Amino acid sequence: PGATAGVLVKALGIGAAPVQLCWLQFLPYCNPREKGFGVSVNFTNHACMDIGMVVDRKTGKRFMDEHAGRKIKADALFKVIGTDENYPIALCDDATVHAINPSFVKLPLEMGTVKKFNTLEELADYFKINKAPFLEEVQKFNGYVKAEDDKDFHRILKFNKGLDVSKAPFYGIECCPKIHHTMGGVRINTKAQVISAVTHQPIKGLFAGGEVAGGVHGASRLGTVAVIDALTFGMIAGEEFAAMAKKA
């Protein structure tokens, strides 16, 4: 269930110009075992990537700034996943779970996508993480948090407020990107008018805003900005349509 592109298909059918239809945004907080976005997105995002860390099973080490933009993180995840489904492991500790929102972990734990462990060694064994470098990486990360200085990926650590990965029990989950937002769509102008693919002029009476329109955000949209996009161009479209109706 979800978006079916019905409006986009109809608009293209009457001659709307397409723009960047092959550009998709991937959400880097998803789990490969859950259907769709599943129930673990908030846990992976806010507990593991905002506060905790993400590691490559094969190396046991971090490989990205967990605070980077969605595209940067998704690209880094895809590179690690590769062709052999080497899903990275996102993890955090008990102090983090209680500091953010304990409800974020409740349902994923019940469903079994988030796993809980008494020790980091148990976590490494379960997810088949390269144990020795992993344990060293956690200690190094904790040192970075204390110093508020990530020497590897320059992540801003002041937002951790001292929270690291040291208080048992520990939580881990596989993570992967999944399609989240269609960056492309129909071409519009600043008046939210849809542009014709044939005449390159506005199609009379046809307005668009939000995800159905393309060319607004480029290749990667900032989180939550889709709402502002839809509201802004929706208001513009309403004003333009009302003005057009008065002239009719």
Label every PLM stretch briefly.
Residues P1-A248:
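Residues forming the flavin
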